[in-house]
Amino acid sequence: MTRKIPGIIPLEPYCREMVWGGRRLAELYDKELPTDVSIGETFELSAYEGRESRAAVGPLSGCSLQDLVEEYRADLVGAEVWSRYGGRFPLLIKLLDAQQNLSIQVHPDDAYAQLKGLQDAGKMEAWYVLHSDGGRVAYGLEDGVGREDFSAAVTNNRVAEVIRFYTVERGDLVFSPPGTVHALCAGVVIYEVQQSSDLTFRIYDYDRPGLDGKPRELHIEQALEVIDFSQQLPGPVPCPDLRGQVLVESEHFVLHGCGLESDSAEHAAEGSFLALTLVGGRAVIRDGEGEYALGTGATALVTAGGVCEIAPLGDEKLEYLVVAVPT
């Protein structure tokens, strides 16, 4: 017999060691990280195989998100989301700690992934900068750079000369549709929401070894096939004051930024589940069945049809991001 589905499921992340990672997520957000390794990513909301987040508390504690998707199906994700994606949970939320530059890379779209018979979907993503030590992001190409120019830059080891770099601060938003050449650079910590996919075509990786001591694979041919050379990107958008506005509205996810100094706010998961991630302050989140305390950097899932109330804990302003699948 299926267990009763909770309205709110606080989540425990999967931690992933990366050659470019560090320990800032423990320092900034008190994350419990594996000892003596450089953690680059925490998968806060993830049903991606081998990197699943898990229910943190309550009767479902320890259950992976994928297990919960398989058990509750449309009751968890929403009827329209289930009809569109089936058992494949569509979104993934991470926190990333870049203590070194990430590889310069590009992601394909769904059509390319299907055309090539790839297992994963395409990958659209958005970043919200949580912390920056004067760090930068690589984002888009310089004006007039075409396929031949880019290919020549790769061949001559001059990729950085044809890419735009921006210094970022907390509150900056970066939206990367498929086909965008991009990279997170050293000294930046971000929140990332993306399609649940690991399709990444590396273009340049600084000639460094991976965790196994060997150079990581590059994917130049595939990258040239999927880069959108016609893109005109605005650069990072400052969004330091979260007050309930839509930050990103796309075919795969809608991202809101919210802020509270007192009182409380209510969020209804209409048509799709919601995922709430605290990016400043502490909160209590509740519905008619339970109440949970969340610290900065924590994520909770509100199941489809559920309604939650969120309120600040303490005097610090509460800031949080809310994401859903458009229906």
What is each of the regions a protein language model found here?
Residues 1-145, 205-231, 255, 327:
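Transition-metal
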Residues 86-88, 96-101, 111, 132-134, ...:
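Ligand-binding loop in jelly-roll beta-barrel domains
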Residues 93-94, 102, 119, 125-128, ...:
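His/acidic/aromatic-lined binding-pocket segments of jelly-roll/cupin-type domains
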Residues 135, 264-265, 281-286:
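Short beta-strand segments in beta-sandwich/barrel cores
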Residues 152-159, 282-284:
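Short, structured beta-strand/loop micro-motifs enriched in basic residues and often containing a Trp
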Residues 156-162, 173-175, 181-232:
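An exposed, glycine/acidic-rich loop-and-rim segment of catalytic or binding clefts
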Residues 163-175, 288-306:
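Short acidic-glycine-tyrosine-enriched beta hairpin
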Residues 201-273:
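C-terminal amphipathic alpha-helical segment
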